[in-house]
Amino acid sequence: MMATLFWLCMAIVVYTYVGYGIVLYLLVFVKRLATKAKPLADITDDRLPEVTLMVCAYNEEDIIAEKMDNTRRLDYPSDRLHLVWVTDGSNDNTNVLLSAYPEVKVIYSPERRGKAAALKHGIKEIDTEIVMMTDANTMLNPEAVREVARLMQDPTVGCVSGEKKVMARSDSDEAAQGEGLYWKYESTLKRLDSELYSAMGAAGELCVIRRQLMTDIPDDTLLDDFIISMEIVKKGYKIAYTSNAYAMEYGSADLHEESKRKRRIAAGGLQSCWRLRSLMNPLRHPVVAFQFVSHRVLRWTITPVCLFALVPLNTLLVLSGEGIVYTIIWILQILFYASAAAGVRISKYFIFMNLNVFRGMAYLFNNSTGMWEKAKRA
């Protein structure tokens, strides 16, 4: 019984972090052999759709000049790109500084109710079909808007997820380095997910939706971008992923600040699993159920439990004299945790990320507003 439980936990951990990527790659490889995708053509300037770039900002006075300089460098006709900043609850100089930019429409409410509420507030004031949501502290590449407009030519695409690139200010910036490695891995899975059928969610750094597909999500939603994009999948549309439109931001200042983010994301992941549980039904959503459970649900729920159960189970099996195989695996596990304690980047961030899932559980039960403390960036 103990050996069975050990191997079950091992299988879940390996499948979540290695196996799914391999299976996904093989499925995409077979799909490429069976079908030939027709590439979408570039759009000439006279046929480009109107797009609204919406930024939800809370007390972002320090970053406005840099963000607006980046926005003005976007390669898109100015008469077709509308700029909206939603600054609900801001009590610094955010609104004053934005008033210096005549092209920006500021939407403001004195009450701070969280990002989900701010997004809904902003969407109501927008009338373009395509809405490009991004964060104040993320910088977009100049071609980003053209790329998402090109992908939105496909009527089956309801959302576009851009790539997130995490920058580190120095080689010693372990939080940013660890986060950057994670997002490289995550971007690979997103690209393959999108090629198989649909990406499993979009990150708020660069999330583009068709306005009419926006769902009225609850104000206490923690992962608003993820829920909004996956609700679009629930309606039968796809999330396209592209690395040609990307958002750049600096990583958290340190692991303590990064823990704030990971804790919120873990809590939001658990919340999302419950609110999107209908997508796990393989009879209604066969491909999406496979992708959603494999890519998201496992790592947000059972996999961290299985990961940290491996050492005690393995120890009991070694003490019971079950065989040399268990002794070898136990030694490898101890070496892995020792490398994390010694500061080896990959193992340390992997353990750190999974530990924060448990902290996220406590965060979820203690947070009912959808608001959070921002992590300080490097």
Where are these regions (language model features)?
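A conserved acidic beta->alpha catalytic loop
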Residues: N70, V86-N95, E111, T138
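Short, acidic, metal-binding catalytic loop of nucleotide-sugar glycosyltransferases
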Residues: D69-R80
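Short aromatic/hydrophobic "clamp" motif used to bind/position activated sugar donors
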Residues: V131
